[in-house]
């Protein structure tokens, strides 16, 4: 039987998913092969129910199996990622949103932390995963560097109990490694760490799970993205052209045919500088409205503009995110960002789905 299954897989390996150089077997789209007595049946897994290539791929599979292996009957069950069972830990998670940046140093983790707090203050149930494996900063920003998550048994399976601070459930690799030691891991190790935190955490009911991704679009970054189910992605940038150029790469990655994750919009961080002694003044030290212009060009939302103010730095250093003070100017900026993100997720109509990275 194994030899027959291998023959079928070898033939189906000749079927390329349209628009990519990868076969449907390499993309793990072929499952549950059964064959015998002139009949073969298997399951084809597609990302979306409205995939325009469903018919063409099925037709090609049927033709090749009849031509090369002589099957008279080919039965193909078509299923979509939305229909597949979620991992136990994510069964009650409504939306998973990636917070990303094409470039380091643009304040992505600061935005992710304060967005999580703002969503929690708006009444949502929120979780935050620090997937920046090589530079985890969430424990510091939430003032819980000394926290030690423990294991709990849920449904006969051991899961990690997240740390809870300011109404946000938190998991970070920073809780499990020496803060003074460099994390020198290859891609698979980093991917496994993320998967363990996301699918091995006891998240229970969440309206939003935010994933603070590493900066960039490297192979490790793409591997991390494909291990989780995403409702959408947020791209953080400063107004500078050097940062915007990398933001474009991030947008293109999420919108590429092999990933197809909705980009909810852009966040312009460090939009302007306002000194404490001159609260009405705005100094555009990194340029003006760069992210707004990029959002317009790409047909995306500008989800928020976050200024540079001293309290953001102080909040990050002290473990007290500025979004906790929702009546302050900067707190209001993050509350507006939270409202816009919630609206954008609702408008996409996308529930969490897995992605497969192709080249």
Please name every model-derived segment:
Residues 59, 207-208, 214-314:
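Conserved catalytic-core segment of NTP-binding enzymes
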């Amino acid at each position: 039987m194994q030899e027959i299954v291998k023959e079928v897989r070898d033939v189906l390996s000749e079927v390329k998913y349209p628009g990519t150089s990868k076969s449907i077997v390499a993309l793990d789209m072929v499952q549950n092969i059964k064959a015998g007595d002139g009949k073969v049946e298997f399951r084809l897994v597609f990302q979306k129910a409205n995939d325009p290539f469903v018919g063409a791929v099925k037709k090609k599979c049927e033709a090749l199996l009849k031509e090369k292996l002589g099957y008279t009957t080919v039965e193909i069950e078509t299923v979509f990622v939305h229909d597949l069972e979620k991992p136990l830990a994510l069964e009650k998670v409504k939306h998973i949103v990636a917070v990303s940046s094409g470039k380091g140093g643009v304040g992505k983790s600061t935005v992710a932390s304060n967005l999580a707090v703002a969503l929690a203050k708006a009444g949502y149930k929120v979780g935050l995963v620090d997937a920046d494996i090589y530079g985890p900063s969430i424990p510091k920003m939430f003032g819980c560097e000394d926290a030690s998550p423990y294991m709990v048994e849920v449904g006969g399976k051991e899961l990690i109990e997240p740390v809870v601070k300011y109404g946000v459930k938190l998991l970070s690799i920073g809780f499990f490694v020496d803060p003074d030691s460099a994390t020198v891991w290859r891609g698979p190790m980093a991917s496994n760490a993320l998967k363990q935190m996301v699918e091995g955490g006891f998240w229970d009911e969440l309206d939003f799970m935010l994933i603070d991704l590493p900066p960039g679009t490297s192979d490790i970054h793409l591997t991390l993205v494909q291990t989780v189910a995403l409702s959408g992605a947020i791209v953080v940038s400063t107004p500078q052209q050097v940062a915007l150029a990398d933001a474009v790469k991030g947008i293109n990655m999420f919108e590429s045919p092999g990933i197809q994750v909705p980009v909810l919009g852009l966040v312009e961080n460090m939009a302007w500088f306002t000194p404490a002694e001159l609260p009405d003044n705005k100094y555009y030290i990194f340029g003006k409205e760069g992210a707004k212009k990029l959002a317009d060009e790409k047909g995306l939302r500008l989800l928020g503009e976050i200024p540079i103010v001293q309290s953001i730095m102080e909040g990050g250093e002290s473990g007290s995110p500025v979004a906790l003070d929702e009546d302050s100017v900067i707190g209001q900026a993050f509350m507006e960002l939270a409202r816009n993100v919630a609206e954008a997720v609702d408008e996409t109509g996308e529930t969490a789905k897995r992605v497969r990275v192709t080249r």
